[in-house]
């Protein structure tokens, strides 16, 4: 895992803003399973990568995005053997390999239990040493948005930073 730099923080913050502000991001996810939402997230993240490479003055930013962005189940791409922990291997939902090795996890939850599962997976990605950073996107399905509100608590804030 790399230490955070201003450039890496900016990249991940801009990725987050791009995702959550996208009109393509479904706000009501209760009728969809995680796999369906992940399918909808792909073009949003891909678009961010294209824009990133455009800002870097790449000659062909779309080919850069195709080369450095992967998703779980994508055949023939990023097939490196993952580090095993607790007798299994953990694969992120999405992977960005340039400018940083970033594992991306997506979870939707009406309770904290699924959130904890996503954070546990994120921890495994981090401890496995393959990724520089992990971005975990959580959509709060609870009635009163208690998961989002809990992020302001000291313990939760320490965990997600």
What is the predicted role of each segment?
Residues 28-40, 46, 55-100, 112-114:
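Active-site metal-binding core of divalent-cation-utilizing nuclease and nuclease-like domains
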Residues 111-116, 126-161:
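Nucleic-acid nuclease catalytic cores
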Residues 1-54:
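Interdomain/boundary linker segments immediately adjacent to catalytic/signaling cores
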Residues 108:
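Conserved protein-kinase N-lobe ATP-binding Lys motif
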Residues 117-121:
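Charged helix-capping and loop-helix junction motifs
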Residues 21, 97-101, 128-132:
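Short glycine/proline-enriched coil/turn segments at helix->beta-strand junctions
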Residues 104:
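Conserved beta3 VAIK motif of the Hanks protein kinase fold
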